[in-house]
Curated annotation (Swiss-Prot):
Keywords: Acetylation, Nucleus, Ubl conjugation pathway. It is found in: Nucleus. The keyword Kinase does not apply. This is Plant UBX domain-containing protein 7. Residues 138-168, 299-329 are annotated as: Disordered. The gene is PUX7. GO terms for molecular function: protein-macromolecule adaptor activity. Residues 7-48 form the UBA-like domain. Residues 385-466 form the UBX domain. Disruption phenotype: No visible phenotype.
Length: 468
C-alpha cells in the first residue's frame, strides 16, 4: 500500500492524523499509518488504543521542546485572562478517547426473541398487536402512553415524534389484547384456578400471521356483553402459538388452524367446544349459553347420574340360569294376558269414549286456562335512533336460536309473544319459562312484572326459553 501512495498522499494522511491526534509528531503519525497500511481510520483507532495501554511511553514518541514551549505560551496566555486554576503541567493532558463500538446486524428472529426475554423491548409494529402477554401489561408500550411523555419538560423533538407516532398507536389500540379479561399464568395454573372457582376454562390461541386473531381482539373480546359473560362465568386464557405454552396446547388438542377458541373442562382437560377463525360476538354468546347454565362440577355430577346403576353388577352373559328362566316365564304370562284382554278392549272401546275424558283433552284444558293472553307483537324496529333500540337473543326449547330488535321501552311480555310466534301450533299451549343467561347467574323473568327491557336488564342479552 505504501508503494502505491505518492509522497503527497502520504503527507496528506500524516497531516490528517496530526489534526485528529493533537500534539503528536509527524514521526508518530507515520509509524501508526505504516502499521495499518496507510489506513487513516484504523491508524487513529490503534493510536487511541495504544494510548490507553501505555504503549506510547517510549522516547521516540515524546514531543519536542519547541512544541512544549508553544503550548506553554498558549496556556499561559489563557491563564492570564483570569483562569488561575489551570496548572502548566495540564498542557500534556489529552481527553479520554471515545470507546470503540462494534455493531452487528441480526435477523428478525433475533429481534423478536429479544422482545420476549429482554428487559427493554423495542417498539413493536402497530400491526403486531401483542408479543408477550405476561410482560406487556406491566410495562408501558405501544398500547399505553408513558406517563413521562406527558411532562412539561419534553423537548420539541420529542413532541414531534409523539405526534408522528400517534396514528400508529391509535391503530394498535384497536387490536389491543383483552388484558382486563386474561388470566396471567401457565395453562396448568389456569386449569387449577378454573377448577377451584368451578368455572369453565375459555382458551384463545392467537397468531400474529393471521388477521383473524386481531379481529377477535377488536370485535369479539372488546364487546361489552362478551366481556361481562366471560367475567361472570369463565376463566379466560389467551396465548400465542409460537410460545412454549402455545405449542403445548396445539400439540395436546391437535390444533391445525389458528386462531382457535376452546371451552375446556378444567377437571378432566376435555375439550367441550371449539371455534376456529373469527367468531362474531352474537354467535359466541349463543354458543356459550349451555355452559352458563352450570359449572364443570354440575356437569360431572350429571354425567355420574346418567350411568346405569348396575354398572358394577354381573353382565347379561353371566346371569344365573334361574334368573333367565324366571324372565322367560314372565314374558309368556304377559303375552297370554295381552291376548286374553284384546277382545275385551275392542268391545268396551265405544263405551269408554263416551264416558271417559281423554287425558290429552284434560291437559289441553288445563294449559289453556293457565296461559295468559299475550300482547300483540309490534313490527320490528329498523333504522331510526339506535340508542333507543336493543337486541335480544333467544334460545327456544327445541334448540333454535333467534335474534330480534326491540325498543328499550317495550315490556318483557313481548318476549313471550315473540317466542310463541316462533313455535309450532301444537307447542303453543305449553307454558314457557324465560331465564336471563347473562351476566352472572341465571335470573328467571316474571311475566306479571310490567318492567321494560331496559329496566329488567334484558336489553342486549341472551334469553333461554324452557318448558315449565
Amino acid at each position: 500500500m505504501e508503494g502505491m501512495l505518492s509522497s503527497g498522499d502520504q503527507q496528506r494522511l500524516v497531516s490528517s492524523f496530526l489534526e485528529i491526534a493533537v500534539g503528536q509528531t509527524a514521526e508518530t503519525a507515520r509509524q501508526f499509518l505504516q502499521a495499518t497500511s496507510w489506513k487513516l481510520e484504523e491508524a487513529i483507532q490503534l493510536f487511541y488504543i495504544g494510548n490507553e495501554g501505555g504503549m506510547l511511553q517510549s522516547g521516540t514518541h515524546t514531543q519536542p521542546a519547541s512544541n512544549d514551549d508553544a503550548a506553554a505560551q498558549s496556556w499561559g496566555a489563557a491563564t492570564g485572562t483570569g483562569n488561575e486554576m489551570i496548572l502548566p503541567n495540564d498542557v500534556d493532558e489529552v481527553r479520554a478517547p471515545l470507546p470503540v463500538v462494534r455493531e452487528t446486524l441480526y435477523g428478525e428472529s433475533m429481534y423478536y426473541g429479544a422482545m420476549r426475554v429482554g428487559n427493554s423491548q423495542p417498539e413493536p409494529n402497530s400491526l403486531i398487536a401483542f408479543r408477550n402477554f405476561s410482560e406487556e401489561p406491566k410495562s408501558p408500550g405501544i398500547w399505553e402512553p408513558d406517563e413521562g411523555d406527558s411532562s412539561a419538560s419534553a423537548s420539541a423533538s420529542a413532541s414531534a415524534s409523539e405526534s408522528a407516532s400517534a396514528p400508529r398507536d391509535s391503530l394498535a389500540s384497536l387490536y389491543r389484547p383483552p388484558f382486563h379479561l386474561m388470566f396471567q399464568g401457565s395453562f396448568e395454573q389456569a386449569k387449577t384456578t378454573s377448577s377451584s372457582q368451578d368455572k369453565w376454562l375459555l382458551v384463545n390461541l392467537q397468531s400474529t400471521t393471521e388477521f383473524s386473531s386481531h379481529m377477535l381482539n377488536r370485535d369479539t373480546w372488546a364487546n361489552d356483553a362478551v366481556s361481562q359473560t366471560i367475567k361472570a362465568n369463565f376463566i379466560f386464557w389467551q396465548v400465542y402459538d409460537d410460545t412454549t405454552e402455545g405449542r403445548k396446547v396445539c400439540t395436546y388438542y391437535k390444533l391445525e388452524s389458528i386462531p382457535v377458541v376452546l371451552v375446556i373442562d378444567p377437571t378432566t382437560g376435555q375439550r367441550m367446544r371449539m371455534w376456529t377463525g373469527m367468531v362474531d360476538p352474537e354467535n359466541l354468546l349463543e354458543d356459550l349459553v349451555p355452559f352458563m347454565d352450570g359449572g364443570p362440577r354440575e356437569h360431572f355430577a350429571s354425567l355420574s347420574k346418567k350411568r346405569p346403576r348396575g354398572s358394577f353388577s354381573l353382565t347379561p352373559h353371566s346371569k344365573p340360569k334361574e334368573d333367565v328362566a324366571k324372565d322367560e316365564e314372565e314374558e309368556e304370562l304377559q303375552r297370554a294376558l295381552a291376548a286374553s284382554l284384546e277382545d275385551n278392549n275392542m268391545k268396551e272401546s265405544s263405551d269408554d269414549q263416551s264416558t271417559i275424558i281423554p287425558e290429552e283433552v284434560a291437559v289441553e284444558a288445563v294449559t289453556s286456562a293457565v296461559l295468559p293472553t299475550f300482547p300483540p307483537l309490534p313490527e320490528e324496529p329498523k333504522g331510526g335512533d339506535r340508542s333507543l333500540q336493543c337486541r335480544v337473543g333467544i334460545r327456544l326449547p327445541n334448540g333454535q336460536r333467534l335474534q330480534r330488535n326491540f325498543l328499550k321501552t317495550d315490556t318483557i311480555q313481548l318476549l313471550w309473544s315473540f317466542c310463541y310466534s316462533q313455535l309450532e301450533e301444537s307447542e303453543r299451549k305449553k307454558p314457557l319459562k324465560l331465564t336471563q343467561a347473562i351476566p352472572g347467574e341465571s335470573k328467571t323473568l316474571e311475566y306479571e312484572s310490567n318492567l321494560t327491557l331496559e329496566q329488567s336488564g334484558v336489553a342486549n342479552s341472551m334469553i333461554s326459553a324452557t318448558w315449565e
